[in-house]
Every structure is written in C-alpha cells, then in structure tokens.
Amino acid sequence: MNPISVDNVVTTYRFYAPLYDRLFGAAFEPGRRALTQAVRNLRPSSLLEVGVGTGLTLSQYPSTSRIVGIDISTHMLDIARERASKLPNHDIKLAAMNAESMDFPDGSFDCIAMPYVLSVTPNPEKLVAEIRRVCRKGGTILILNHFSGSRFWWFLERAVRSLADKIGFRSDFCFDEQILKYDWEIESVKKVNVFGLSKLVVIRNT
C-alpha cells in the first residue's frame, strides 16, 4: 500500500469536495446519525469534530454545545461554512488545520468526534495522540470508521485496494491494531452502516 501524505489527502479532497455529498453522503449517513445521537446524549459543553469535511453532521449536534470543526481541506471547509451559515442557533467555528498537529491547548474539549478520518490520515498514531491531548481527562472520544477483519471485508479489501491506494485510503484497517492497543477505556462498540461495515467506538479519555 502506498503511504498516505498530507499533500495526497489535500489533492484528493480538492477533487472530491464538489462530489463528496453525492458519493458518500447517503451511504455513510447511518453512521453519522449514530455518532451525532451519541453526542446529543452526552450534551458536552464543548465539541471538536476532527475531519468536519462538508459539514454533514453540523445540524445534528446540540445547539447548546460550543462546536469547533477542523479539516485539512479548505475546499471541503468552504462547503461546511455554507452549511454552518444556515444554523444561526449553533455556536460553530470552522478552521483549516492538520489534526496531527493541532493548535489547541491541552484538555480544550469535553468531547471529540472523528467520523471517517482515522483510515485516511497519514499517521494514525500521531492523530490519536493529538485527540487524546486536546480532549480533557475523563472526556469522551467518538471514533467512527471502517475496520477490516470480516469475511466481507476480506473480499472487498482486495477488490478496492488498488483504487484505495490511489486516493489515499487504507482499505485494510485492523481494529485491534488501531483501537485496542491504546490504554484508554472503551465504553462501547457499535456496528453501523450497510452490512455493519463501520463501527462507532465510544472511548473515555484516560
């Protein structure tokens, strides 16, 4: 598999930004709804969404939360800003930022939401270290992502691997290696999306 670089991610999403909602909106919406429902149940005073993209989740977050969304793609953020402008009752700030090196002080947020990001970042371990740093101790981290391992994924990974390499997407992404190896507290794991191909992982930051 070709290594993912920041330039690769930026170039990919410059191309996909106008098409993203049509290609990935409905297909991944069940997972997004599960994630935003979890956030509404938590009602955090402050929320950071890492990889806010085109802002598909913004309207589903509680209006009582201070919401910050970051993305490395300015083209995706342009669409997110248009969405945010139609939510006058929400406190939303959006910024272009590399999530592997964030500008926020330690413990800045009660809750971190990270939908469909972990498998497209150049360095997942560095990203995890950063989200743990900016989430307060005892806060909640929500990771929504596909993970490999099922028989269906075994076939799908091989079918899409060549394309995935070209667009900077890890099709072979192991749950044990990417989630279980850390010394955080996993509160729940829920299968979401068609065939349960993705998981919503709720984590207590320790």
Q: Model features per residue range: what roles?
A:
Residues 48-101:
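Class I SAM-dependent methyltransferase SAM/SAH-binding core
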Residues 201-206:
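C-terminal lobe and adjacent flexible extensions of AdoMet/dcAdoMet transferase-like proteins
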Residues 125-137:
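A short glycine-rich, Lys/Arg-flanked "PGG" loop and its adjoining helix->strand segment in the class I
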Residues 111-123:
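A short SAM/SAH-binding and catalytic strip from SAM-dependent methyltransferases
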Residues 1-43, 56, 155-162, 193-196:
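Conserved class I S-adenosyl-L-methionine
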Residues 7, 24-26, 142-198:
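C-terminal alpha-helical "lid/dimerization" subdomain adjacent to the S-adenosyl-L-methionine
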Residues 67, 141-142:
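A short hydrophobic/small-residue beta-strand
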Residues 100-111:
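A short acidic, Gly/Pro-enriched loop at the edge of an enzyme's catalytic core
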